[in-house]
């Protein structure tokens, strides 16, 4: 069954110890699901010993206990640096049982002690209000992967081993999870791994055959197809299949020895010879029954080996005495008296199977990455400043400027190998081409003549899968490193749900004192909604921000720097920060530059502010506030202000620019929120505010609805109008252009009288002229293309 | 190169015609990218003939033109019913060129006539403001798949062929797209296809080797691995590899004959013998150079066969005369004078290669699915009504009731086979088990003893991939059928981006008179945020609604029925509707029933209304409005009202329930929006409104910020607090529970005085009691579990 010549022998005695360890973990798992008392079954089981609400999942648990016990043996024997990723959902009972058995659980939670009293608490807390969930949740030591949402285990595992040459991640992939898209493409991660400078992932595809109520695809194709699939993905599969425990122990022990042997041999070869060409890494296919060792039948229906074992197999002991009897038989089938001493502690000869100290998978520092976090070395972002010869001078594209800053971050941290850039083939397209001056795209598939910036090692990872980019980066961050995900704004929605889960992970871990803070997850969304000139409607969606701000205020930050110097300041801040999700939206096309570096740093530190030089207010309140957030809205707002000041010189205008979107929220809602008095000082208590916003306009209303002056805030933003057209026409289609903004202001300012109405008429003429011009010429009018900021009043 | 014994011969003459057709399409493609005039090159090319803004994508185009020409020959020869799905992004020039050549384009757009004048317009409109995008956009006849966002071509194709036994979808899969997760798992769709009752998908994996700036993975693994991968996915690959046009024509023609032969033989066998066991369907791997036939070098850098050909190879003819020269040479290399007559019409002997009438891929009715749409036969939803013995009587779980209604829709439409249910293994979990009384899960992988509800044909498709469910359903709807996607609320975020694209597709097609309306995309989100008792925090996310309401108001509808009778009424409405996206959020757990069928139908028709029987107002305005939206918020609101009415009998309370969320928006913003006077009549102009909401609370503010009484609307909803706990405790953690709602009301009603304060103190005690009780018992207090509605005042 095992396809190898280099098999090793594991003694029968060791196999018996593994079996005992497995039984102990199974016992503790069933105990978690069922017992509120009588944890050692010192007396016959009574209904009072059983939890009133039976919640939890058994199906995947015995298989994961089996794997964990075998990994313990292998780690100890080979002194491996290994962590465990539990891909199948609902593996909670297994990882909790095992970290408890190895001692790492009680070290973190001393009240869950390794004795009868602690075991009782261990059982009671599981799936209990105020207790712990049934996944490999953040509360569980050794976990970097929750498993609540399926599909990301392999991506997280690869993220963990990049730049960790000694680390092996044992990644259990559920056969349900394997049907998801993200997992199906994650097998290709092996084309991005360097065997010399990265660690290894050992995938263990766990074919227990069923999901919630269905068989799984990979369990229902024949052996030949499954083997071809894994080989086609570039892996060497080792099959372990069956259900007889002792035969399976022998097969699994041998499979692991073969796999570890192959990993070591691949790594040794690459590291000694420098030959880093892509190896065929080993992986294990473990086919074992769902709900293995659980009840064979429940109420006359087959349970072990079917989807009926997915949750709680015997679900109604209160009403059905037969269930209670079966639960007791099931628990006693593990012969707990052989495994645990009378105080409930695992017998030493069994406990010795597991490694000790930080080699325990529940105590490995890589699984609590903040412990390993080293601050990034950062150049002074001010050194990359754009010279502002005059307000509004044309830059080279804001992200291109930041690209040089990031290039030097790459360079400065080359030694520690703890910074990476991820993107779906868009790092150049997003304007970060400068990084390729100092590094390459890491790529381990074939390289041919004429390829550019591809190499076996490099700081940039590009695969056309936003899921992979996100999953790799999350794994990289969770193991204590730093990184950046650059992505088209519209398509970052592809990872909405992954973002949700990571934000939830950060929220929960921030409340666990033993979890050290990790580096922030930084998104750079260049190629944004307003500049999809050649891509059109499908590439226009600024709604990721709406998804982000739904998450806990302590975790999420959103920045929309208006120019290159502001972007530098913001990126510097984000890359230094910890335990946030930072979303930065910035442009890549040549666009006006407004603030000197000093002004930008000050403006970004405040996150919001009045641009005195753009407005013309005196000491009293202005007549109108022109607010803007985002690079394109800032341009259109300043162009509108320029028109207003020229044509209505008596009007006093205040210009407010927003970089840190969270400043708009009340302080009670977000730590960055402005106090009401500060907000009122900026936006006035009663003047009209014409607000040009980068994203969907109602997001501003959602953030400001409690503010004094909210009824006077009028927001323009993207409203799902667009196609392939000119950059300026995109703003026209969404009423965000300078002409509309001027008209909006006049509509709110009846006191502008006849002059206002004449200016409005002029604006309408301009819009007609614009439409005619682009229809004839396919580009914007010269007065738009060549526009320069001036404040003539 | 072709792996088959049954090869056929295509005459050399035919191959030459195919080549001519291909050259014509290539000529028209390059023309679209470059030319504003001189479409037939009747004079030497001048810079004035070239567009000022050069936008578009060449890289994928010649390969797709190659495929389309070969498909034309095959369709005509075999009288195939075939449509074309363009998976690679930016195949716009190819599909536009080909539908123009075959005549379907000019039939829809008569001004783009098949002559020199029309050709000039065809060229000018491409990637031009007000023109057409560079994808296979909705504007292009024959398209059901835009391709702007990558990854869904195969899923759409399979959706199209379910229940269309005569249809073949030729699906071009880009090798960039093939890296995405959704595409990587979509290959497994063959495990769900019935060769007798469904049609066939012929995937053509187009390995042109490059993405935007990178090679692709599948082009850089060796032949053996690629073949293993495709075989592992269950396909039989046929390889066509090379770059010499005439050799490639011969190979491709033969490959298609083999593939079509295999498809027909598989279908014939299944249909004649009844053996529907899973066949190995054929697929084609076409390896050809990116930018094939384009310039070999540009500015000294290799272009054809590299990623440099991705967009516009010669990008600056205005400044670089050499570019202009090369453009002309490139265009003339296709020898247009051999292909087009002097009026610009394709010569008849070449045009004859293509099929005619509805066999043309641009005219096939399946690609304009509304043409084939047949109304669903619907039973009377009132027949499934829940008897309301008294207000608040406990139901069996709302979706379980609707399950029977849907079961009978399945039954009634069995004959026409135009209704399907899609879900990621959750149809039973979401409460729709009744459908398995009359149908099965369609499944074509192995079936073994003890399997339940699996069969080669069935109306339910379940794969653990939300992407697949969504993609299949979209393909099914786009080809003129009906369906339902049932999904856990939290995990529907996985398809946020697919929803975005489908909503955009619906918006654009609704503006094209020749595009017939299709059935709505219906989501049933059961297993919602408030009832994740055993799944916890990762399964709690009601934010899909925020994503949905960002899209065009004409397209999106959101319903939150409070009980089973309302759910029946809503589902009836949604399944009859066209060209919307309907999102329905409903519960599956036993919960109180409020409205008789008659009341429910009336309430849902209005979408919002006062529940007189719950409040106690007299003719004048009430003291407070207690509003609710969603089943759990409605329960907690009514429980709060019950407490308020008992303890503060002098208080007059109005209860408003919202089913149709869009009613909250102003009429100007959404067609369902209430007028301001109607809104004021419900919510008053100045009374406090305590609003209990299903999702994130700020969504209500976003919808109502323009309303008269907005400042008095106080919303409770999910605020990212939760874990494994009791159902009621979930509401407590988010301040949405009855006790908090009572306290909220009292806080806003100082006139309740000492009695109010005493009630508030009582509520605080209740919360303490609740916390203590669940900590001790792991379940809710009896007074919560056994609560029954009563209005004692």
Swiss-Prot record, chains A, B:
Keywords in alphabetical order, please.
Lyase, Thiamine pyrophosphate
* Presence of keyword Iron-sulfur: no
> Per its Swiss-Prot or TrEMBL entry, what cofactor is needed?
thiamine diphosphate
Q: Which GO terms describe its molecular function?
A: aldehyde-lyase activity
One biological process term in Gene Ontology: carbohydrate metabolic process
EC class of the enzyme, as a word: lyase
**Listed EC numbers:** 4.1.2.-
Q: What is this protein called?
A: Probable phosphoketolase
Q: Name the species this protein comes from.
A: Rhodopirellula baltica (strain DSM 10527 / NCIMB 13988 / SH1)
**Highest taxon in the source lineage:** Bacteria
Q: Which InterPro entries match?
A: Phosphoketolase (IPR023962), THDP-binding (IPR029061), Transketo_C/PFOR_II (IPR009014), Xul5P/Fru6P_PKetolase (IPR005593), Xul5P/Fru6P_PKetolase_C (IPR018969), Xul5P/Fru6P_PKetolase_CS (IPR019790), Xul5P/Fru6P_PKetolase_N (IPR018970), Xul5P/Fru6P_PKetolase_ThDP_BS (IPR019789)
């Amino acid at each position: 069954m095992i396809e190898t010549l280099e098999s090793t022998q594991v003694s029968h005695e060791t196999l018996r110890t593994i079996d005992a360890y497995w039984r102990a973990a199974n016992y503790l798992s069933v105990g978690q699901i069922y017992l509120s008392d009588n944890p050692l079954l010192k007396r016959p089981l009574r209904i009072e010993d059983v939890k009133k609400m039976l919640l939890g999942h058994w199906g995947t648990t015995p298989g994961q206990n089996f794997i964990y016990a075998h990994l313990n043996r292998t780690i100890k024997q080979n002194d491996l640096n290994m962590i465990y990723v539990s891909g199948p959902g609902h593996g909670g009972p297994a990882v909790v049982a095992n970290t408890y058995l190895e001692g790492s659980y009680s070290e973190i939670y001393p009240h869950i002690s390794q004795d009868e009293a602690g075991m009782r608490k261990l059982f009671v807390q599981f799936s209990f209000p105020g207790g712990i969930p049934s996944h490999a949740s953040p509360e569980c030591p050794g976990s970097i992967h929750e498993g609540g949402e399926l599909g990301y285990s392999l991506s997280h595992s690869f993220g963990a081993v990049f730049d960790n040459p000694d680390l092996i991640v044992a990644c259990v992939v559920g056969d349900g999870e394997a049907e998801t898209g993200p997992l199906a493409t994650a097998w290709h991660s092996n084309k991005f791994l360097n065997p010399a400078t990265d660690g290894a992932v050992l995938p263990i595809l766990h074919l227990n055959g069923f999901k919630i109520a269905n068989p799984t695809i990979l369990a229902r194709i024949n052996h030949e197809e499954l083997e071809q699939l894994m080989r086609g993905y570039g892996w060497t599969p080792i099959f372990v299949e069956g259900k007889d425990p002792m035969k399976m122990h022998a097969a699994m022990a041998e499979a692991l020895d073969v796999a570890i042997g192959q990993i070591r041999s691949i790594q040794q070869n690459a590291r000694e010879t420098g030959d880093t060409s892509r190896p065929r890494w080993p992986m294990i296919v473990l086919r074992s029954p769902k709900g293995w060792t659980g009840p064979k039948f429940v109420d006359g229906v087959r349970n072990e080996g079917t989807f009926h074992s997915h949750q709680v197999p015997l679900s109604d002991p209160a009403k059905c005495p037969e269930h209670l009897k079966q639960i007791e038989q099931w628990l006693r089938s593990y012969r707990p008296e052989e495994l645990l001493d009378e105080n409930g502690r695992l017998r030493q000869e069994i406990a010795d199977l597991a490694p000790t100290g930080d080699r325990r998978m529940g105590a490995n520092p890589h699984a609590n990455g903040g412990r390993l976090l080293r601050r990034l070395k950062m150049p002074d972002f001010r050194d990359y400043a754009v010279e502002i010869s005059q307000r509004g001078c044309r830059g080279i594209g804001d992200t291109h400027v930041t690209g040089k800053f990031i290039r030097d971050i790459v360079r400065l941290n080359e030694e520690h190998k703890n910074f990476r850039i991820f993107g779906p083939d868009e790092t150049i397209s997003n304007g970060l081409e400068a990084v390729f001056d100092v590094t390459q795209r890491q790529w381990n598939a074939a390289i041919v003549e004429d390829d550019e910036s591809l190499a076996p090692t490099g700081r940039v990872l590009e695969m056309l899968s936003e899921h992979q980019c996100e999953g790799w980066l999350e794994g990289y961050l969770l193991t204590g490193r730093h990184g950046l995900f650059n992505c088209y704004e519209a398509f970052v929605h592809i990872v909405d749900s992954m973002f949700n889960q990571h934000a939830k992970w950060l929220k929960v871990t921030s409340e666990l004192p033993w979890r050290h803070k990790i580096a922030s997850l930084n998104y750079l969304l260049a190629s944004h909604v307003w500049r999809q000139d050649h891509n059109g409607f499908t590439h226009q969606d600024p709604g990721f921000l709406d998804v982000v701000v739904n998450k806990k205020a302590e975790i999420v930050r959103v920045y929309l720097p208006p120019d290159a110097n502001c972007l530098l300041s913001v990126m510097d801040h984000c890359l230094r920060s910890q335990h946030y999700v930072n979303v930065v939206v910035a442009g890549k096309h040549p666009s006006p530059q407004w603030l000197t570096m000093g002004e930008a740093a000050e403006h970004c530190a405040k996150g919001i502010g009045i641009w005195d030089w753009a407005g013309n207010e005196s000491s009293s309140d202005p007549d109108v506030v022109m607010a803007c957030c985002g690079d394109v809205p800032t341009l259109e707002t300043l162009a509108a202000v320029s028109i207003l000041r020229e044509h209505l010189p008596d009007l006093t205008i205040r210009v407010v620019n927003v970089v840190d979107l969270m400043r708009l929220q009340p302080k009670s809602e977000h730590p960055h929120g402005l106090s009401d008095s500060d907000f009122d000082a900026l936006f006035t208590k009663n003047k009209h505010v014409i607000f040009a916003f980068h994203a969907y306009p109602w997001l501003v209303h959602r953030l400001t609805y409690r503010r004094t002056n909210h009824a006077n805030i009028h927001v323009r933003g993207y409203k799902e109008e667009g196609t392939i057209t000119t950059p300026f026409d995109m703003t026209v289609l969404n009423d965000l252009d300078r002409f509309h903004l001027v008209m909006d202001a006049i509509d709110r300012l009846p006191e502008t009288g006849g002059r206002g109405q004449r200016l409005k008429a002029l604006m309408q003429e301009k819009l007609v002229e614009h439409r005619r011009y682009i229809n004839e010429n396919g580009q914007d009018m010269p007065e738009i293309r060549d526009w320069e900021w001036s404040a003539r009043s």
